[in-house]
Amino acid sequence: MKKSLSGLALVLCAHFAAPLSIASPFSESYAAYQQALAGQDKALVALTAAKAYELGQGYFESDSIDLVNLELNLATALQDNGESQAAHEHFNNVIQVYRKHFGRDAIELVDPLIGAAQTMAASREKVDLFKQAIAIAEDADKPLLLAEVKMLTFNGLASTHFYTREIRDEALEAYEIYRQEMPADAMARLKATYYVGMIKAAEKKYDKAVPLLEEVIKQFSVLDFSHPYKLAAHARLVEIYEAEGESDKSTQHCVAIGSMKPWSEKQEQAPLYREAPKYPISYARDRREGWTQMSFTVDEQGFVRDPVVLASEGGQQFTRESLKAIKRWRYAPKFVDGKPVPAEVSVQLEYKVN
């Protein structure tokens, strides 16, 4: 999912209260920012957004909404550039000003609330920020906005210890909205279909998972390359059919994976489906924390093979649960010269009590 809300278009700086027709250092810096947006250089976008915000402080009144819109631009640019801590601070500033200017439940708050949630570690506060955004979207009577916020919430919490049935239901509800509001080949709907299929597969509700994953494969088959979600759907169906003892059907999907055309000739392996490990009940009760470092091979079909514990802290149950979780992860495989190849991956799973 995208980091920002495509349905909102809340970056309002294109509509300044003050005219920008007269050349000034600020107007030139803002033009440079807009030009950078058209390119692919995230670092340049962040740099020009910061300059526009800096000069905007001398151009607009301190309580101007235009100034805080510039700060939202900066926060988003920093987030896209991987500078989460700095982005989070700016998102929080925007939230405070927007609440004063628009009200506590204004739709303008959705974008900075989501941004603030996405740029912080898993915590109760992160969950609360997502829930605030959902509540506002629900009141806005904008179904597609609500569906997008629900999917962002699911994606933001699915691989954390705050993943609950309620968070799972956000994805299911988003899928139902997309199914009613968008055509079958719409990307947002396809992504939701993929995730709901994965959820149903994880719950071993294979009769519901299979048609969803088959639909993903069908819709992506029109592309002239193999999308990561299509590959992951094939991989999950291999697992489902093997579990059901239907090896013939499983083999069909294995063959399909082997004949796929990569979306990049030198595509690195990429995680497509990750489940958070279970927190051992006895450890949680004792508020015991820890971590487990592991390495493993992502094979040509995107499955995790031969996981090995490199180091751990906190207890054997953390190690045991980490290994169980890792084996359920799915990747898009690495491609070299257009062919899938095994790749070595290292990860660290952390267990923290909030």
What are these regions (language model features)?
Residues 323-354:
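Short, positively biased Gly/Pro-containing turn/loop motifs at secondary-structure boundaries
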Residues 21-69:
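N-terminal leader/linker segments that initiate helical-solenoid repeat arrays
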Residues 36, 71, 78, 113, ...:
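Residue at a conserved register position within TPR or TPR-like alpha-solenoid repeats
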Residues 299-335:
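A short, well-structured alpha-helical segment
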Residues 242-285, 311, 324-327:
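Acidic, low-complexity proline/glycine/alanine-rich linker and hinge segments
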Residues 60-68, 102-110, 140-147, 182-189, ...:
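Helix N-cap/loop-to-helix boundary motif
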